[in-house]
């Protein structure tokens, strides 16, 4: 039947998981790592990355909200006068992977929601800026993998 919805593709962070609660602590931790615990430099890095210092929130199109670990490493390494972008990228990827799984805060009972949607015959997918491995690990940790037809990280 034309016009029938057959599938739903969800964005992970900010839709299924509380973006701020999940990622603000991770972003601050890598800023501390990069800045060597220099409070002024940490604040500068967070501002460069897209955090509003007045609200503590991240601009939706900022590197911290929508960029890759590589983009963030390039930005912050340049601001710190560092030349270890490749090493920072590896560190950020590993940190985000661990933190994203451990600290993700679902906005509702996601397995129940996804189960109801599957019961209606819908195909379900997730899209995220996370790495593919981190996306899969988060879906597995929250019991969503059996419900998903597609995960794109």
Protein language model regions, located:
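Substrate-recognition "cap/lid" segment bordering the active-site pocket of phosphatases
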Residues: 103-105, 112, 125-153
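N-terminal helical cap/lid subdomain that shapes the substrate entry/recognition surface
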Residues: 4-120
């Amino acid at each position: 039947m034309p016009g029938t919805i057959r599938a739903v593709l969800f964005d992970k962070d900010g839709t299924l998981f509380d973006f701020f609660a999940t990622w603000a602590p991770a972003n601050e931790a890598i800023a501390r790592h990069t800045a060597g615990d220099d409070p002024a430099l940490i604040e500068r890095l967070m501002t460069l990355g897209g955090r509003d210092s007045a609200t503590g929130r991240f601009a939706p199109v900022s590197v911290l909200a929508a960029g890759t670990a590589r983009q963030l490493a390039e930005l912050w390494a340049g601001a710190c006068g560092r030349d270890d972008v490749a090493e920072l990228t590896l560190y950020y990827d590993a940190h985000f992977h661990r933190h994203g799984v451990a600290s993700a805060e679902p906005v509702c009972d996601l397995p129940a929601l996804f189960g109801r949607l599957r019961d209606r015959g819908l195909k379900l997918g997730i899209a995220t800026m996370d790495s593919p491995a981190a996306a899969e690990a988060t879906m597995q940790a929250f019991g969503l993998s059996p419900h998903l037809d597609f995960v794109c990280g």
